[in-house]
């Protein structure tokens, strides 16, 4: 496996970003199809903003990617995705390790991770890597027409979900 720095959006990356967005929507019960044009636009925005982006190449094929955001020497994993056929083969570990290398280069001990609450695989992955501290929660107003289906409790607070 090779981890390469990405400097321009490619069709392969656009497809993976589109698949990542489909997967994220599925965590809320939304069925959608990959939008490769939107995936390309998203990747181009990351690159234009100067976000470090890396891809994992396995046997000449793109297997996954990670997008990092560096804010005042704090590194956030903005998104990380591995294609189904490459999961559980060390690809996510290699990509996440790259994010940790960036954090270490700033003298930081941790990477901050955006994770959807229903993304149980990612939460389990992060736990195995020692990420067990809940740092922030994101709170917003409901979208027009959005129907929440659950209540999530964090400490003494309850939130629609």
Predicted segments with their positions:
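Conserved acetyl-CoA-binding loop-helix of GNAT-fold acetyltransferases
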Residues: 82, 88-101, 120, 124, ...
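A short beta-loop-alpha structural element at the N-terminal edge
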Residues: 1-18
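Conserved GNAT acetyl-CoA-binding A-motif
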Residues: 103-115
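Glycine-rich acetyl-CoA-binding "A-motif" of GNAT/NAT acetyltransferases
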Residues: 61-64, 121, 133
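A conserved beta-turn-beta hairpin within the catalytic core of GNAT-like acetyltransferases
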Residues: 69-78, 87, 134
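A short helix-loop-beta-strand connector motif used in the catalytic cores of GNAT acetyltransferases and
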Residues: 43-55, 64, 76
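Conserved GNAT-fold acetyl-CoA-binding loop/helix
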Residues: 21-43
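Conserved beta-strand-loop-alpha-helix junction that forms the acyl-donor binding cleft
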Residues: 113-122, 144
């Amino acid at each position: 496996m090779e981890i390469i720095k990405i400097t321009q959006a490619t069709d392969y990356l656009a497809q993976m970003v589109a698949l990542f967005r489909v997967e994220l929507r599925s965590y809320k019960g939304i069925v959608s199809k990959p939008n490769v044009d939107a995936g390309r636009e998203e990747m181009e925005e990351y690159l234009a903003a100067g976000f470090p982006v890396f891809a994992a190449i396995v046997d000449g094929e793109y297997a996954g990617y990670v997008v990092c955001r560096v804010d005042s020497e704090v590194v956030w994993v903005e998104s990380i995705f591995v294609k189904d056929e490459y999961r559980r083969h060390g690809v996510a570990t290699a990509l996440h390790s790259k994010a940790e290398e960036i954090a270490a280069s700033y003298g930081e001990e941790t990477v901050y991770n955006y994770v959807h609450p229903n993304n149980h695989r990612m939460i389990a992955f992060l736990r195995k890597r020692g990420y067990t501290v809940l740092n922030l929660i994101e709170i917003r107003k409901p979208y027009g027409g959005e129907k929440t289906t659950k209540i999530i409790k964090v400490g003494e607070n309850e939130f629609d979900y």
